[in-house]
Regions:
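Non-catalytic, usually N-terminal nucleic-acid engagement modules in DNA/RNA processing proteins
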Residues: 1-95, 99-104
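Glycine/Thr-rich beta-alpha phosphate-binding loop at enzyme active sites
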Residues: 84-86, 91, 108-140
Length: 140
């Protein structure tokens, strides 16, 4: 089944929820904006499905893992995206392995993102996510 989500300005956040299946939170904005944080806390209390993103595109590198784990504990999203490395399959796989050792008990479903620059790198990263990483979902 295809699900729809849209990032939305806070002023129309609740209206947008009437058109979407889940909400997509950027972790760095949870720290920066109390209104943003409150909106997602309310969404979770209402039973909305929420994905917590590590803000890699916005920050150009993934949010710091320890702080990210703390936000997962605090927010309790449905899903979270493990910190990855843009277009870097080896670093992404290493970060996933490290995450799995240090944060195996965080409360939510885990999404692993496939990264790489070449077909072979992307294929290797996908295989790692599928066979080794113990993720609940793979994102490409």
């Amino acid at each position: 089944m295809i699900k729809i989500a849209h990032e939305a300005p806070l002023d129309i956040f609740e209206e947008i929820q009437t058109y979407t299946d889940y909400d997509y939170a950027l972790v760095h904005l949870l720290e920066q904006n109390p209104r943003y944080r409150d909106a997602f806390e309310r969404a979770i209390k209402k039973g909305r499905e929420v994905i917590l993103d590590n803000s890699i595109f916005e920050l150009e590198e993934a949010f710091e893992p320890e702080r990210f784990a703390q936000w997962i504990e605090r927010l309790r999203p449905t899903w979270y995206i493990v910190p990855d490395a843009l277009e870097d399959s080896k670093k992404t796989m290493n970060q996933m392995a490290s995450w799995n050792l240090r944060y195996k008990d965080v409360p939510a479903k885990k999404i692993g993102v496939v990264q790489g620059k070449t077909y072979e790198q992307i294929k290797a990263c996908y295989t790692f996510m599928d066979k080794v990483a113990d993720v609940d979902m793979i994102a490409i």
